[in-house]
A protein has these predicted regions:
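Conserved helicase motor core of SF1/SF2 NTP-dependent helicases
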Residues: 1-6, 12-122, 126-223
Length: 223
């Protein structure tokens, strides 16, 4: 961790069974979770790592895409593979996946399972519905740890669908062994401009909310 909030996030992962890392792109929320997962595997705290994210961009049409199931879902899981390659020898990843030590799968494939003795990361959680979030969190099994990451400003769900990440804190806040960590543009560790870009968009969104739909000028018809 390079910032105070990142250290708090890492400490929360160590101290809690379920941790939420919420913040904009580039804050290290997924990278740090992946680092802790690999560490837990190497120190035999868990026997496997499970990485998942909702393939929301594919919607229900994934079955109509050409190719095998793996070829269909891999593009939506690519960011998780990329993060994993930063942590372990890339040549070892096929072996780890083949042995079941590392599993990368879309969120829909978690339904009906109990995830024991695993470090489980749900990425892009802003694109879960409240029902999907509940489904995922109740997969928690014995000896497992869950980290949920996401950015509530980047929701890609269809109109009218609530984000499970936006409502979950109000539901679970205050429950023992669950932590919520918020990261900001000050925690961005990518190119220095990324933090400035994130901050600029935050300011724009604040102004848009203040003067948006309720501004009569904006709603006035042009003659």
């Amino acid at each position: 961790p390079k910032t105070l909030d990142q250290k708090r996030y890492v400490d929360a992962i160590d101290a809690h069974t379920v941790t939420f890392g919420i913040g904009p792109a580039g804050t290290g929320k997924t990278y740090l979770a992946m680092a802790k997962a690999v560490q837990a595997l190497q120190t035999k705290q868990v026997s496997r790592i499970i990485l998942t994210r909702p393939a929301v961009e594919a919607g229900e049409k994934i079955g109509f895409l050409p190719g095998t199931l793996s070829e269909k879902i891999d593009p939506y899981l690519r960011p998780l593979y990329d993060a994993l390659r930063d942590m372990v020898d890339p040549d070892s990843i096929p072996r780890l996946i083949g042995a079941g030590t590392v599993e990368v799968a879309p969120l829909a494939y978690m339904r009906g399972r109990t995830l024991n003795d695993a470090f489980v990361i749900l990425d892009e959680a802003q694109n879960t519905s409240p029902q999907q979030m509940k489904m995922f969190l109740t997969r928690l099994g014995s000896g497992s740890k869950i980290v949920v990451t996401g950015d509530i400003t980047q929701v890609d769900l269809p109109g009218g669908v609530k984000s499970g990440l936006r409502v979950v804190q109000g539901i679970l806040d205050g429950i023992d062994d669950i932590a919520f960590c918020n990261l900001t543009s000050h925690d961005v560790v990518r190119h220095r401009l990324v933090g400035k870009i994130v901050a600029a968009y935050d300011r724009y969104d604040t102004v848009a909310e203040s003067y948006g739909p309720r501004n009569p000028r904006k709603n006035r018809k042009t003659r």
